[in-house]
A protein has these predicted regions:
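Extracytoplasmic/secreted proteins, especially bacterial periplasmic and envelope-associated proteins
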Residues: 56, 60, 74, 78, ...
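Immediate post-signal peptide segment of exported/extracytoplasmic ligand-binding proteins
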Residues: 25-34
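Surface-exposed binding/hinge segments that line
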Residues: 84, 130-171
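Solvent-exposed coil/turn segments that connect beta secondary-structure elements
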Residues: 38-41, 49, 70-71, 88-89, ...
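Bacterial N-terminal signal peptides that target proteins for export
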Residues: 2-10
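Aromatic- and charge-enriched surface segment that lines or borders ligand/interaction sites
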Residues: 81-125, 141, 147
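C-terminal segment of classical bacterial N-terminal signal peptides
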Residues: 17-25
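N-terminal lobe/hinge region of extracytoplasmic solute-binding protein
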Residues: 36-87, 117
């Protein structure tokens, strides 16, 4: 078989094999996320899982306070509408109104304070600890306003708040 004939056969086979592939779409009414992976996960809880697949699935389900734009590397609002550094160890967040969790619970400062204070307690065993061991606590300043108190200056705070630190409902 000549190279040209081999290439033509290969190309035709590839087109046939991929021409009948369709994208998976979830129905709006079934509230189910189907994901195919090659192993069983111990958990899809973002804070008790270190498997890459679990982290990817978690990112499909949960959001953080901030989002880092991959093109500009700018930290943008996500569950927070804005943030400001009060000093080198204190960040305040104004939170987005009108957000609901998957369980129908309204998102507010109680959820952020619950999540961040739960994670600040080493007894709860969040993995990996380096993602969450850099703050002391979170305080509720209003229904949609939160203060995060850091242990010391932490230049990567916004990166962590836009990545591995996601917010859970307090129920």
């Amino acid at each position: 078989m000549t190279v040209k004939k081999y290439f033509s056969t290969f190309l035709a086979g590839t087109l046939l094999a991929t021409g009948f592939v369709s994208v998976a779409q979830a129905g709006k009414s079934d509230d189910t996320l189907n994901v195919a992976i090659d192993r069983e996960l111990e958990s899809i809880d973002n804070y008790y899982n270190t498997a890459r697949e679990g982290i990817v699935i978690s990112r499909m389900v949960w959001d953080g306070l901030l989002y880092r734009d991959p093109k500009t590397n700018e930290y943008l609002p996500n569950l927070a509408t804005s943030y400001k550094w009060v000093d080198s160890k204190t960040i305040e967040f104004d939170l987005r109104k009108g957000v609901k969790f998957h369980n129908g619970e309204k998102f507010d400062a109680d959820d952020v304070v619950f999540t961040l204070n739960y994670l600040a307690d080493p007894a709860n065993g969040a993995k990996p600890a380096r993602n969450v061991n850099w703050w002391i606590n979170a305080e509720k300043l209003g229904e949609y306003k939160v203060r995060l108190n850091l242990k010391k200056e932490f230049p990567a705070a916004l990166e962590f708040l836009s990545g591995p630190v996601v917010i859970y409902p307090n129920d």
